[in-house]
Amino acid sequence: MLQVYLVRHGETQWNAERRIQGQSDSPLTAKGEQQAMQVGERARSLGITHIISSDLGRTKRTAEIIAQACGCDITFDSRLRELDMGVLEKRQIDSLTEEEEGWRRQLVNGTQDGRIPDGESMQELSERVHAALASCLELPQGSRPLLVSHGIALGCLVSTILGLPAWAERRLRLRNCSISRVDYQESQWLASGWVVETAGDVSHLDAPALDELQR
């Protein structure tokens, strides 16, 4: 049975400022760096063999810190990027106009093909993160990969594995540097395919991360 660990990046400057990041970027805070170190300490006991990361700066830095602890190389995969939030990226949440808030709500409330102008839909996000996860099945037998990605992207992945719609990710609390695990099983008696073992574990962190509204 293949076990895949899923880690959200550490806290960033824009997380702390309540800015919409999407595929734009901001650096990890000192707290975010510490969170990544704590994931690294935990990961050393998990037998991680591969680290696969989104190619955005905040995930790259998180992956580098974890890789240093695990002694693993990093592969970057753009399919693990965060949802493209279009024209709302870099904006503070509290600064959105009524029209802009309407775009955001369409996206997160499951409106068919809802998207922010110049952004992508939750369905498009779901397709690419599932493709990235499926690539793990091509790794050598006995591999135990760790994927570093983003809040909405990982929430969408876990939700859809559970058979929920992509926009149900808002019902999952995946804090900065939380660890989730999904397993691929083949069984005559149990559900074959991907199953969720754990979601949003933060027991390795000193203190809870920000309860962000935006990732």
From Swiss-Prot:
Q: Which Pfam families match?
A: His_Phos_1
Answer yes or no on keyword Isomerase.
yes
Q: Which reaction does it catalyse?
A: (2R)-2-phosphoglycerate = (2R)-3-phosphoglycerate
Tell me which residues this entry annotates as catalytic. Answer: H9, E82
Q: What class of enzyme is it?
A: isomerase
**Keywords linked to the UniProt accession:** Glycolysis, Isomerase
Q: Give the highest taxon in the source lineage.
A: Bacteria
Q: In which pathway does it act?
A: Carbohydrate degradation; glycolysis; pyruvate from D-glyceraldehyde 3-phosphate: step 3/5
Q: Which SMART domains does its entry note?
A: PGAM
What Enzyme Commission number does this protein have? 5.4.2.-
Tell me a GO cellular component.
Answer: cytoplasm
Q: Name one GO biological process term.
A: glycolytic process
UniProt similarity note = Belongs to the phosphoglycerate mutase family. GpmB subfamily.
Q: Which PANTHER family match?
A: BROAD-SPECIFICITY PHOSPHATASE YOR283W-RELATED (PTHR48100), HISTIDINE PHOSPHATASE FAMILY PROTEIN-RELATED (PTHR48100:SF1)
HAMAP family xrefs: PGAM_GpmB
**Protein's recorded name:** Probable phosphoglycerate mutase GpmB
State the organism named in the record.
Salmonella arizonae (strain ATCC BAA-731 / CDC346-86 / RSK2980)
